[in-house]
Amino acid sequence: MIPFVKGWTLTDPKIFIKKDAAYPESPDDIVLSLNKMMVKEAYYKDSGLTINTLCRKTNTNRSYLSRSIHRLYGTNFCDWVNVFRVNEAKKLIEKTDGNFLDLEDLAIQCGFNSVRSFSRVFKARESCTPKQYYRKRMKKKNQMKNL
């Protein structure tokens, strides 16, 4: 369906959306720059990270940032942060040289409050526990060495 304004057909309704003076950047720009900050500054490693902390860093308000993350990634703030944390855990697991890291140390290094929440989130995202993921990676490494 194409929206109408006083007899005119709008093919691009965005041209009539007024930018908010308080937020000159588009929500996508804010979240994408925040994504870069998350990777560069590793904010996700802080177990006390909140959306309010990131709002202060981006000069936005909580609901605006939350909606922007949801619009761009289709997920909530906590799940978005957990993506970074699980990816960090996978990197650390892959860097190990045969000795599996202690789960508690791994969880803390990645920004989780507990081993239980770390394992639950990891399993939900990767369909396996961190130890199962480690075993798969070791098995794959050994197969590559034998080629």
Question: Model-flagged regions — what are they?
Answer:
Residues 56-59, 70:
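Intrinsically disordered cytosolic tails
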Residues 84, 88, 102-105, 117:
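Short amphipathic alpha-helical segments
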Residues 51, 65, 82:
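DNA-recognition element of transcription regulators
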